[in-house]
Amino acid sequence: IEEISELIQKGQAKKVVKLVNEALEAGFPATDILNQGLLKGMDAIGVKFKNEEVFVPEVLVAARAMNKGIEILKPYLQDTEHQSKGTVILGTVKGDLHDIGKNLVKIMLEGKGLEVVDLGVDVDAQKFVEEAKIHQAQIICCSALLTTTMPEMKKVVDLVAQEHLNVKVMIGGAPVNQDYCNEIGADYYTDDATRSE
């Protein structure tokens, strides 16, 4: 299982698949393979990314390897106590077409066992709120990389309040900071994908 974690960090998807299958055959519980192998490896990559020891391409390759492993485990996990820890609605706000930061956040959140509904880019406030209702989400996560699109985040916060939704709003992106988060009344601010946990 330790080896699976190391292979995730190297992004070696084929070897991950082989070892996950071997671990299952050897009788290791699927939840252990997931938590101590796949997720542990992704966590380690998250820390390295935060410390600038690895960069976006390495994170994406590791995520691909992790997802291949998760695909094999899925049928086994559905039979066990591995339940989703919650649902997050994720998207880049209206007028903003940047998605690399959002995609990293998605990977990190899924790695924590959260269900992520990715709405993509250029998402208006109404859409965030509608999807949160449909999926009974606990968190709406908005990303913006342009100062001009930041006000869209406030629209999301205001609409959540207006609709009396029991949903937390998390914001992130290059121009955003904790002061802005406080100013618009959002619940959480994250300055990088790895801290989105």
Put a short name on every predicted segment.
Residues I1-T80:
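Long amphipathic alpha-helical segments
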